C-alpha cells in the first residue's frame, strides 16, 4: 500500500444531539450553532502519508510413501517441511504546511461531496464534504518549500519480522478388520520453530527500537483413529478420534505495537501465546440413495485447550500512557463443544425421471459450547460463557440444475451470532451478528477438444452487512455494507 495519504480537518467545541430511539441505527445531529459540514471555520488536524510493505514467502517440501500388504492393508508414511516468513515494514510521516492558511484555502477549493442518498445503511447518514482524492494525491509533500515533515515513531511500532518452520512426519496404517470394517490409525508429529522480532515504543522519548530476537519451539504428537463400518452397499457408519492443532497468527505473536492516535487505541502482540489444541470425537452415519444423493447424521465432541481471543480493556495504562482501548490476544481458557450435524443431498429423479437434472443439497449444524477455566482478570468465576468464534447454528442450502453443459445454482448460508472479542465485563463483549447470505451462479460449457464456458455469478443478493454489536443485539458497534457483487466472463480450455 504505497503513498496512502489522509487529511484530517477539525472544528472543536461542537454540540450534538444523540438519537438512540433505534439503537441499531444511532444518529448524531449537530445542534443549532454547530456543524459537521467542512467549511472555512475548520482547521487542519493532521496530514499524513504511509508506506506499507508486507513481504511473505512460503517454502514447502513433502515426500509421501505407500507400502501395500496382503488383504488390502496399506502402510503410509511421509514427511513435510513448511517454512514461512513475513516481514511488515511501515514508514509513516506527518506533514505540516509552512503556510497553513494558504493550504486550508486551497484545500477548501478542492473538495467533493461524498453524500449519497442511496447510502446502504440509511439515507440519513450523509458523509458530507471531503478533500478530493485527486487533490490529496497531487500534493507535493516532499517539497521542503511547502511542507515540513516528521517521522511518526509510534506508527513504526507495528513493524515486525517473523519466521516459522514446521517440520512434520506421519505414519498411517490402513487395515481391513473384516470385509465390511476398516480401521485407519496414525500418528503425526509436528515440530514448530518460531523466531520473531518486533518493536518497542518509548512514549517519553518518542523513539522506537527493535526487540531482541525471540525464539520458541514446541513438539506436538497428534494421533488419529478412524473406524468405518460398511453396513451394506448403501449404509456407512464412521467413528473417529483425532487430535488437532491451531497455531497463533504472526500478528498475535510478535511483540509489536499498533497505535491508532486519532482514537487513542492500542493493540499489542503476545509472545507468550500457546497454540490451541483440540481432542475431537466424531460419530456419523451416511445413507446413499440409489440415484445421486445421501442423507447423513452425525454427532461430535471437541475438548479445546488454550483457545485464543482478543482481550479488550478500557482506560488502560500501558508504558505511562492511558489508552481509551487496549487490545491484546490471550489464551483465555479451555472449552467443551458438543454438536449435531445433519445433511441431505438428492436429485428429484425419484419424483419423475425428467426432474433428475434438478437437485437439492442442505446441511445444518448445532453446536453447544461452554468455556472452562476462564482466566480474564475479574471474570474468573463467570459461568455459561460460549466459546468465542463458535456460532450455535449454521445452515447451508443449495438448489441446482445440471443438464447438457448448463449449470445453475442458488445457494443460501446462515450462521447465528457469536462472541468475537471479550472485554473486562460482559457489557464490553463484542459479538459478530447473525448472517444470511444468498448467491446465484450459472454457466454453460460446450465443445470437446476446446471447451468454452460462459459464466455469470451474483454474490450477496441479500446485501448482508458485516455487523458487530456490544453486549445486546440492538447496540450496534460497527456495520459495513458491501452490496451485491456481479461477475461474468468466458473461459476457454485447450
Indicate residue ranges for each PLM-predicted region:
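Gram-negative outer-membrane beta-barrel transporters
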Residues: 301-304, 313, 321-419
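Outer-membrane beta-barrel signature, preferentially recognizing the C-terminal barrel domain
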Residues: 154, 158-167, 216, 245-304, ...
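Transmembrane beta-strands of outer-membrane beta-barrel pores
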Residues: 1, 50-53, 57, 81-87, ...
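Residue-level signature of outer-membrane beta-barrel architecture
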Residues: 63, 67-69, 171, 175-177, ...
Amino acid at each position: 500500500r504505497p503513498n496512502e495519504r489522509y487529511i484530517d480537518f477539525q472544528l472543536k467545541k461542537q454540540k450534538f444531539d444523540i438519537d438512540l430511539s433505534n439503537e441499531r441505527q444511532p444518529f448524531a445531529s449537530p445542534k443549532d450553532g454547530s456543524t459537521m459540514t467542512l467549511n472555512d471555520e475548520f482547521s487542519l488536524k493532521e496530514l499524513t502519508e504511509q508506506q506499507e510493505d508486507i513481504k511473505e514467502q512460503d517454502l514447502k517440501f513433502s515426500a509421501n510413501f505407500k507400502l501395500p500388504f496382503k488383504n488390502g492393508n496399506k502402510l503410509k508414511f511421509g514427511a513435510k517441511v513448511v517454512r514461512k516468513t513475513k516481514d511488515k515494514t511501515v514508514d509513516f510521516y506527518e506533514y505540516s504546511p509552512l503556510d497553513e492558511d494558504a493550504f486550508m484555502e486551497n484545500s477548501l477549493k478542492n473538495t467533493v461531496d461524498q453524500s449519497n442518498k442511496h447510502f446502504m445503511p440509511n439515507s440519513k447518514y450523509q458523509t458530507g464534504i471531503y478533500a478530493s482524492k485527486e487533490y490529496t494525491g497531487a500534493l507535493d509533500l516532499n517539497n521542503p518549500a511547502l511542507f515540513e515533515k516528521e517521522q511518526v515513531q509510534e506508527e513504526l511500532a507495528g513493524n515486525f519480522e517473523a519466521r516459522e518452520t514446521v517440520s512434520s512426519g506421519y505414519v498411517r496404517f490402513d487395515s481391513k478388520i473384516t470385509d465390511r470394517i476398516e480401521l485407519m490409525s496414525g500418528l503425526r508429529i509436528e515440530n514448530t520453530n518460531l523466531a520473531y522480532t518486533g518493536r518497542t515504543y518509548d512514549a517519553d522519548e518518542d523513539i522506537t527500537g527493535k526487540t531482541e530476537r525471540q525464539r520458541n519451539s514446541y513438539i506436538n504428537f497428534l494421533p488419529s483413529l478412524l473406524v468405518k463400518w460398511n453396513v451394506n452397499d448403501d449404509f456407512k457408519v464412521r467413528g473417529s478420534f483425532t487430535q488437532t492443532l491451531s497455531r497463533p497468527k504472526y500478528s498475535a505473536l510478535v511483540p509489536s505495537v499498533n497505535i491508532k492516535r486519532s482514537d487513542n487505541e492500542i493493540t499489542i502482540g503476545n509472545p507468550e501465546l500457546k497454540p490451541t489444541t483440540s481432542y475431537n470425537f466424531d460419530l456419523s452415519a451416511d445413507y446413499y440413495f440409489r440415484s445421486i444423493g445421501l442423507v447423513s447424521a452425525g454427532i461430535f465432541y471437541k475438548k479445546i485447550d488454550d483457545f485464543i481471543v482478543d482481550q479488550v480493556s478500557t482506560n488502560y495504562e500501558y508504558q505511562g500512557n492511558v489508552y481509551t482501548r487496549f487490545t491484546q490476544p490471550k489464551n483465555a481458557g479451555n472449552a467443551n463443544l458438543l454438536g449435531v450435524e445433519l445433511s441431505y443431498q438428492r436429485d428429484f429423479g425419484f419424483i419423475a425421471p425428467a426432474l433428475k437434472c434438478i437437485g437439492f443439497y442442505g446441511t445444518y449444524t448445532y453446536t453447544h459450547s461452554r468455556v472452562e477455566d476462564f482466566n480474564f482478570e475479574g471474570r474468573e468465576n463467570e459461568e455459561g460463557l460460549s466459546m468465542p468464534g463458535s456460532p450455535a447454528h449454521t445452515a447451508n442450502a443449495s438448489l441446482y440444475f445440471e443438464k447438457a453443459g448448463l449449470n445453475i445454482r442458488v445457494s443460501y448460508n446462515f450462521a447465528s451470532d457469536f462472541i468475537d472479542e471479550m472485554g473486562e465485563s460482559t457489557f464490553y463483549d463484542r459479538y459478530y451478528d447473525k448472517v444470511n447470505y444468498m448467491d446465484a451462479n450459472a454457466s454453460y460449457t460446450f465443445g470437446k477438444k476446446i471447451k468454452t464456458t460462459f459464466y455469470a455469478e451474483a454474490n450477496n443478493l441479500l446485501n448482508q452487512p458485516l455487523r458487530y454489536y456490544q453486549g445486546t443485539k440492538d447496540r450496534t458497534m460497527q456495520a459495513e455494507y458491501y452490496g451485491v457483487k456481479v461477475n461474468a466472463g468466458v473461459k476457454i480450455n485447450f
